[in-house]
Amino acid sequence: MTMKYIYKYIVAAAFMLSVSGVSAYGQEYKDLVEKAMDYTRKDSLQQAEQLYQQALKLDPKNARNALLFSNLGTVQRRMGKIDDALQSYTLALNIIPYSTAILLNRATIYMEKGMLDKAYLDYCNVIDLLPEDKEARLFRAYIYMQRRQYKEARIDYNVIIGKDFGNKPARIGLAMLDQKEEKYVSATDRINLLIHDYPEDASLLKMRANLELEQGQDEAALADLEAAVRREPSSGETYELMGDICLRLKKKAEARKYYEEAIQSGVSRASLSDKLKKCR
């Protein structure tokens, strides 16, 4: 989730409070909210959380509380209080159920918690309200892919591409879809274009290597993995895979070198003992 939503409702709440006439009772509510917003801007999140909670207790029926619950949820999310943030966003949506910003915030938490079905519903609601919202389309497409609903995922990615032809995540998503559906020529063409546009992105080279491995192109896959590790440090699993490819190609010295790299990157020597024996 981008940071563009974090202060959106803080600003809105400040505006609503500033233009409203307030009683002495309302003044206390207003002061608590203003102090909470100030603490939020200063990253004093615990104090901000407490002040938002005080304001909500002071006037639990205030129509502006949807914005306060949303702000509170964002503060709690930044504090790592994910369950509390989820509850706060839900309380906000109970008051203003068609807020796309709050729906997106709650959906992100559902995704983090692995609650994909609930995230899916929030993303669908956002898309009903804003059919071209990229974030909702991207994450809904991801959920569709997890469900193996490839046709639906492709529709979402294509909606994004239709408005933003160069959108990198959507282009990657379409390449992955082609690969899953064994449309290898199309998948390769898409990944080649991505690598052309983002030549320093090692993850794209690894994607192409994986595609090449599925087609039995070990030499090409090894070349891409070697190029990837030159661009950025890689995981032990990547080096282990490179060792496995070298063993299949009967390049034992190179295989041993990559297995040793894997061990240095965190893979246990014991788990590679049999493979190392094959390198003799």
Question: Locations of the language-model features?
Answer:
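Structural marker of alpha-solenoid helical repeat scaffolds
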Residues: 58-61, 95, 129, 163-164, ...
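Terminal, low-structured helical/coil segments at or just beyond the last alpha-helical repeat
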Residues: 29, 240-244, 248-280
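Register position in tetratricopeptide repeats
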Residues: 41-42, 75-78, 112-113, 146-147, ...
